[in-house]
Amino acid sequence: DEIGCGYVLVENGKIAEVGKGMPQHVRKSDIDAEGKLLMPGFIDIHTHMGFIGDGAGEEGIDVNEGSDPVMPQLRAVDGLNFMDGYFADAVSAVVTSVVTGVGSLNPVGGDMVALKTAARCLDEALIGTVGIKFALGETPKSYYTERDDAPQTRMATAALIREALEKARRYMVITERAEEPED
C-alpha cells in the first residue's frame, strides 16, 4: 500500500516500523524523502558472487569442481572470496542479501549460503547454509561427455542425483537410530 505522508523507522540497519503521519521523535539524522520512492533492499537468490573472482583471473575462479560429478561435501564457505568486488557492486545496487554458491557443472555440486552483502568479513556476512546445488541441465552433460565420463545424458544425471539423495536418506536413518536412547 502507498503511504502518502509517513515515516520509516530504521533500527540497527533494519526496518523496525512504518507508519502514517510524523514519527513521535524527530532526530537530526532523519532524512526528508518527500516525493521519493522508498523500497527495501533487493535479495538475489541465485548468484555465484564470491566464486568467479572480479578481476582475479583463473586463480580467483572457484565456482566449479570438475573432479567428480557428485560433490555434496563441498562447502561454499571454503571457496568463497568475500573480498570479491562484486559484493561492493551489490551494495551500491541496493542488493542487501544474496544466496551464492557453486556452479552447475556437477549434478550434485555442494551447498549454497545466504549472505549479507554489506559486512566487513565473512563471519559477519554469513546468514547460513540454505540448500544444496543440483544441476539437471546441459552443463554437466556437455562437460562430462567432453571428458568421456559419466554422466553423458540427462538420464544419467538424474540417476546420479537419485543415488546421492538415497545415500543421504540412509545416512539420516542411521544417525537418527544412533541418537535414540537405549532401553
Give the ranges of each region predicted by the language model:
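Solvent-exposed, acidic/flexible segments
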Residues: 2-3, 80-83, 154
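Histidine-rich, glycine-flanked metal-binding segment
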Residues: 2-39
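Glycine-rich loops and low-complexity Gly/Arg-rich segments
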Residues: 15-17, 35, 55-57, 67-69, ...
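N-terminal-biased segments
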Residues: 18-19, 38-53, 161-164, 168-169, ...
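Intrinsically disordered, low-complexity coil segments
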Residues: 24, 31, 59, 145-148
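Metal-associated gating/positioning segment near the N- to mid-region
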Residues: 33-102, 106-107, 113
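Polyanionic/metal-chelating signatures
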Residues: 86, 91-183
